Swiss-Prot record:
Pfam families: wnt (PF00110). Palmitoleoylation is required for efficient binding to frizzled receptors. Depalmitoleoylation leads to Wnt signaling pathway inhibition. Ligand for members of the frizzled family of seven transmembrane receptors. Can activate or inhibit canonical Wnt signaling, depending on receptor context. Required during embryogenesis for extension of the primary anterior-posterior axis. GO terms for cellular component: extracellular space. Belongs to the Wnt family. It comes from Meleagris gallopavo. It comes from the Eukaryota. InterPro entries: Wnt, Wnt_C. Glycans are attached at N69, N83. Disulfide bonds join C82-C97. This is Protein Wnt-5a.
Amino acid sequence: SGSCSLKTCWLQLADFRKVGDALKEKYDSAAAMKLNSRGKLVQMNSRFNAPTIHDLIYIDPSPDYCMRNESTGSLGTQGRLCNKTSEGMDGCELMCCGRGYDQFKTVERERCNCKF
C-alpha cells in the first residue's frame, strides 16, 4: 500500500561520574609504548599483557602534576588545601605528593537564618 514504518532509536549518555571513573581506570592502567627501529609500536615492558584495542597506550609519560609546570599548564599542588580524612583526590596523602602538610583548624560563623 506504499506505507512506511518508522523506527527511532534513542541513545542516552551514561552518568558523567561513571564515564569519568571508567576513563580514570583506563588512564591508570595505560600501557607504555615505544617505537622500535622499524618504526613499529612495541610495549616498553614485555612482562605485562599486550594492550588490546580497548586499552589506552602512550609514548610520552604524563607530566608530574605535583610540581608546577608552565609549559604543560599544571599549577602543581603545593599550597592547596587538602582534606586530612579523605582517601580521595582531595586527600592530603595523595594531593601533597609525599611532601607532608601543615594542619590547622578554623572556626567559621555563618548566619543560618534560624527561626524559633
